[in-house]
C-alpha cells in the first residue's frame, strides 16, 4: 500500500517501517503464530496515533494496536498496520496519591509504572508474570489477571475509565454511568444508549449463561451491561476486547497500597487430587495467592 506509507511518512514524526525486515520483527509475538503486517508505525504522541489511524482508515487499512507482544494466542499479529504503543506512548499522565489512582498512556510497561509508584507507597496490583515487558494497554485488552487476582481481581476490577478512539475517529470517554444518559459525554451518548439497550434486552440470557468465575478472560464482557446494584461502567466493555472495539489512548487505574509484611505457607499433599480438593478450603482463609507446584 504505497499510498499508506507515503502519507504516514509525510504526516508523522514517529517511526514508520515498511521494509520486510522491520515488518518481520512484528510478524510474531509470544505465540507460535506468524502473520506479516502491512507496515509498522511507532507514534511519538497520542495525537500522532490518532492521525495514523485516520490515515489508515482513509487508505482502507485495518489497524492493530500492539504493546509488549507478550500475548500467547496471536492477539498482536495480523495483516494490518501495527501501531506500536510501547516505544513512545509510555507516560504517567496524572497521579492522585490521596485518591490512589493514576492515568497512563497505553504503552507504559507494568514494572516501569510500579517503579514510579513505589516512592508514593502505591502499586498497580495486577502482577502478571510478564510484568517486565507487558504494557497496561495490552493488559486491559487481554483482561489480565496475575498471581494475586484472588485479592485484587483482574484488570476489569482495577480500571476506572478509558479514553479511546472509535473506528470512525471519534474520541470518547468510557467510564461509570448512572441511570441518566444525559451524564454521558455527547460523542458517546448514542453508542451508550445502544449498549444499555443490549444489556437490558439480553439480561436474562447473559445472567443464565455467563460463567460465574472470576478469571474469565474469553469473549466480550457483555455482563458489564446488565443492570444491577452498581452503576454500569462502559470501560469494562473495552477490557478484554483485544483492541477490536476501540484504540485506548488514556487509561485510568485504581491503585493499591504497597504490600507490608508477607508470609509464605507450604502444604504437602499425598496426591495431585488431594491438593486440588484442598484448594477450596485454603481460599476461604483469604490468602493473597495460592500456587500449585
Q: Would you name each region that the model predicts?
A:
Residues 1-58, 68-100, 129, 152, ...:
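N-terminal flexible segment immediately upstream of the FAD-binding catalytic core
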Residues 3-10, 15, 271, 284-293:
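Non-catalytic terminal accessory/regulatory regions of metabolic enzymes
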Residues 63, 265, 288-290:
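Hydrophobic faces of well-ordered beta-strands that scaffold small-molecule active sites
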Residues 92-93, 104-286:
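FAD-binding subdomain of flavoenzyme oxidoreductases
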Amino acid at each position: 500500500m504505497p499510498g499508506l506509507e507515503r502519507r504516514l511518512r509525510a504526516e508523522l514524526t514517529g517511526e514508520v517501517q515498511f521494509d520486510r525486515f522491520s515488518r518481520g520483527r512484528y510478524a510474531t509475538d509470544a505465540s507460535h503464530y506468524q502473520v506479516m503486517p502491512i507496515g509498522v508505525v511507532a507514534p511519538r504522541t497520542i495525537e500522532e496515533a490518532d492521525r495514523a489511524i485516520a490515515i489508515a482508515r482513509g487508505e482502507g487499512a485495518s489497524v492493530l494496536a500492539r504493546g509488549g507482544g507478550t500475548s500467547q494466542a496471536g492477539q498482536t499479529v495480523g495483516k494490518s498496520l501495527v501501531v506500536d504503543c510501547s516505544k513512545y506512548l509510555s507516560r504517567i499522565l496524572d497521579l492522585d496519591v490521596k485518591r490512589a489512582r493514576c492515568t497512563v498512556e497505553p504503552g507504559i510497561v507494568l514494572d516501569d509504572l510500579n517503579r514510579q509508584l513505589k516512592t508514593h507507597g502505591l502499586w498497580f496490583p495486577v502482577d502478571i508474570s510478564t510484568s517486565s515487558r507487558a504494557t497496561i494497554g495490552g493488559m486491559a485488552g487481554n483482561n489480565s489477571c496475575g498471581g494475586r487476582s484472588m485479592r485484587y481481581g483482574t484488570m476489569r476490577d482495577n480500571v476506572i475509565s478509558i479514553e479511546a478512539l472509535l473506528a470512525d475517529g471519534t474520541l470518547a470517554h468510557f467510564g461509570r454511568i448512572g441511570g441518566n444518559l444525559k451524564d454521558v459525554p455527547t460523542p458517546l451518548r448514542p453508542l451508550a444508549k445502544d449498549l444499555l439497550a443490549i444489556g437490558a434486552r439480553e439480561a436474562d440470557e447473559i445472567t443464565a449463561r455467563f460463567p460465574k468465575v472470576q478469571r474469565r478472560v474469553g469473549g466480550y464482557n457483555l455482563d458489564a451491561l446488565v443492570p444491577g446494584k452498581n452503576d454500569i461502567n462502559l470501560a469494562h466493555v473495552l477490557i478484554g476486547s483485544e483492541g477490536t472495539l476501540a484504540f485506548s489512548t488514556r487509561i485510568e487505574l485504581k491503585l493499591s497500597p504497597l504490600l507490608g509484611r508477607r508470609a509464605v505457607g507450604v502444604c504437602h499433599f499425598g496426591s495431585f487430587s488431594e491438593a486440588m480438593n484442598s484448594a477450596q478450603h485454603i481460599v476461604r482463609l483469604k490468602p493473597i495467592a495460592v500456587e500449585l507446584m
